[in-house]
């Protein structure tokens, strides 16, 4: 990478621009995402369907949950909230791309001054139904809920973040 410095005497703005470019390339970006979710899609009950749809769903959901910044808070990588979503597909309609599932959602946090973690949240959701077509891109808009899948995961993401924050201090 070649960085060209601009002569200060001819262009005072050039030095500011050059310094900003240097900071952009030198200063590491901090992680802003709050969650580190593991998502498991169990599709053993579904026969005769290409397994790639379930693999794609798992990868897409992990990317959606882990790479989205859910709040304005800044979390370092080691501060991210550990959580898991174990989704068991009980029925899949490939004509409508409808998944009927049950899900176990769990979140943990470290115990102060120890190497242990404790469970913050553990729930089984027996009515976890959504539509997903292979290679769908998941977009979430807080002001307009138009996708049941993103709404479900956003609900649990915000719930987990809120419970985690309350575990450190009342009202986060």
Name every feature range the model reports, one short phrase each.
Residues 31-35, 55, 123-131:
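Membrane-targeting and insertion segments and their boundary/processing signals
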Residues 1-35:
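Bacterial Sec-dependent N-terminal signal peptides
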Residues 100-172:
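Acidic/His-rich structured neighborhood in mature extracellular/periplasmic domains
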Residues 33-100, 111-113:
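Start-of-domain marker
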